[in-house]
Amino acid sequence: AAECLAGLVMHQAQRPGAPFIFGACGSPMDMRTMLFPYGSPDWRLNDLAMAEMARSYGLPVFGTGGTTDSKLLDAQAGMEFANSLLIAAMAGTNLIHDVGYLDTGLTGSLESLVLGAEQIRWVKKFIAGLDVSEETLALDVIRAVGPARHFMAQGHTRRHLRKTLWQPYAL
């Protein structure tokens, strides 16, 4: 964080008012491997702290997501991709980068980008929340159908069925 603040000061001294995106990547280094573990909660906590600092300064923030320590696209990769993307999005990160990085950022693959893109779609749906409106509640349709019939034949159901339930593209 100190390096980012120093960069901000130098940047603004050179060009007052110039755009600046706040953020820094990092966590405690794993001294066994001499690598920074992308998948660790420590990395995510750092991203959360940077997002909070950026918000207090009124600046946009970047962070990482869709990253893993795993060398393969396996269960660990899926869990770490999902955790990191969801945490970054919920923190309000404006620019999420490194999507698709494997093996603590040492490798990447097109397959991991596809998985990352799919999980980004999932996170966007989750962050958007529920659409609660007169149209989506459809109380008039509920009253019209009544307790003993079904909703499958209703135009409202047909209009909303495919866009309400998230569907994966690649998985």
Residue ranges of model-derived segments:
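Glycine-rich anion/phosphate-binding loop at the beta-strand->alpha-helix junction
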Residues: 1-116
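Catalytic-core signal marking the mid-to-C-terminal active-site face
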Residues: 111-171
